[in-house]
């Protein structure tokens, strides 16, 4: 019966269910068992290279020519709104989508024309794709058995993979006996058991509730620290997941990458308005440049009657720009570093546990303040409130760079 069920599983994969088919990248990785055994996960990650890769369905282009590199051992998060092309890009790497043009390389191998099971990948999808009639240990072993691995190697790999994700005690349970977070750990263990060159994570936490999702983000970060050579392409719409996990981020919009770079750099110095607003919350004050970047590394800009110092790109006097300030960098009290000052009218106050959010109007521009500490007596809505911030916590974004 078990053999018949496993043959049925293979048939489901061939029938093309996208989520079950995604498992084939895990189960039927093309790297032979002997090759995988020689290339331990630590230090064995491969780079991924997109060379002008585009995807179209008929006349509709869903991914415009994409050129991008993911370094070995790196976590790259692709984020963007629905329909931005991020999942299409991942599925092109997996081999589920055929590029209309361009090439994809994993390591030194051009995989553009290879089927999913010959690409040496691991993949975890949103709904986990665990086989309900198999115990945890058999789900994790599925890919290895499909490769023809001997029993001893399967036992060793399953034990190692379950230990890595903290699920050793659940080896004999069925998926229905596990929580959502535990099922996701099993799915990750199954992907790791085949020692993939690259791990693809497609919205892996979106089906979990908020608390479990936060815990799983920490688990994935811990996992990558324990396997520093593992290359990960992580697709998500959740900016917090991307900011927490990724070494680099590619922000997608309308089938194009509108920004790409180190996570901290994109957050602190967004190159365009869309990045500033999509990657966390941002206050964007319209300003006019008065003087370009000086010796201290800041430009001088005017917002209404306020003269402000801003970091970022050097622009000519008279240029229109946007001064980006994150809500947590605004303060209701000044200190020696808070040399920038603006004044707004308080509209609303929202308490959210450890944070209090103040909504203000500054010369017609909505401004949010997120604070952990506030004066004992908060001003009433309608009151005039001064706000202070440091030049180093700002970034000038060109007004015409909305992308």
Model-predicted regions and their roles:
Residues 94:
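Helix-to-loop junction immediately C-terminal to a conserved catalytic motif
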Residues 79-81:
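The feature captures the beta-strand-to-loop junction immediately N-terminal to the Walker
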Residues 1-8, 12-31, 35-37, 282, ...:
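Non-catalytic connector elements of ABC transporters
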Residues 102-110:
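Conserved ABC transporter NBD signature motif
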Residues 66-77, 131:
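Pre-Walker A (P-loop) beta-loop-beta motif of ABC nucleotide-binding domains
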Residues 75, 120-122, 126, 130-274:
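ABC ATPase nucleotide-binding domains
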């Amino acid at each position: 019966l078990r053999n018949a069920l496993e043959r049925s599983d293979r048939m489901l994969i061939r029938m093309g269910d996208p989520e079950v088919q995604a498992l084939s990248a895990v189960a039927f990785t093309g790297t032979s068992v002997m090759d995988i055994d020689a290339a331990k996960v630590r230090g064995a990650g491969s780079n991924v290279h997109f060379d002008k890769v585009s995807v179209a369905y008929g006349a509709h282009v869903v991914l415009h020519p994409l050129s991008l590199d993911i370094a070995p051992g790196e976590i790259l998060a692709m984020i963007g709104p629905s329909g931005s092309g991020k999942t299409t890009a991942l599925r092109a790497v997996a081999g589920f989508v055929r590029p209309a043009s361009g090439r994809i390389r994993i390591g030194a191998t051009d995989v553009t024309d290879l089927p999913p099971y010959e690409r040496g990948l691991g993949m975890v999808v949103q709904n986990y794709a665990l086989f309900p009639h198999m115990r945890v240990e058999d789900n994790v072993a599925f890919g290895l058995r499909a490769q023809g691995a001997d029993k001893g190697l399967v036992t060793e790999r399953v034990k190692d993979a379950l230990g890595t994700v903290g699920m050793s005690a659940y080896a004999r349970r069925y998926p229905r006996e596990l929580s959502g977070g535990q099922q996701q750990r099993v799915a990750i263990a199954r992907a790791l058991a085949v020692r993939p060159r690259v791990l693809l994570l497609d919205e892996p936490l979106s089906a979990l509730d908020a608390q479990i999702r936060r815990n799983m983000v920490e688990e994935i970060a811990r996992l990558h620290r324990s396997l520093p050579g593992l290359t990960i392409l992580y697709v998500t719409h959740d900016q917090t997941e991307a900011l927490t996990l990724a070494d680099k981020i590619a922000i997608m919009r309308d089938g194009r990458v509108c920004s790409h770079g180190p996570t901290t750099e994109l957050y602190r110095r967004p190159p365009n308005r869309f990045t500033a607003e999509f990657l966390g919350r941002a206050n964007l004050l319209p300003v006019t440049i008065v003087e370009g970047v000086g010796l201290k590394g800041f430009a001088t800009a005017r917002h209404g009657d306020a003269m402000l110092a801003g970091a970022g790109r050097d622009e000519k006097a008279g240029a229109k720009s946007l001064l980006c300030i994150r809500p947590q960098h605004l303060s209701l009290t000044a200190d020696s570093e808070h040399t920038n000052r603006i004044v707004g009218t308080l509209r609303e106050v929202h308490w959210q546990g450890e944070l209090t959010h103040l909504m203000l109007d500054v010369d017609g521009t909505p401004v949010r303040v997120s604070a952990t500490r506030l004066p004992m007596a908060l001003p009433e809505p309608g009151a005039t409130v001064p706000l202070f911030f440091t030049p180093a916590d700002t970034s000038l974004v060109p007004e015409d760079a909305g992308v």
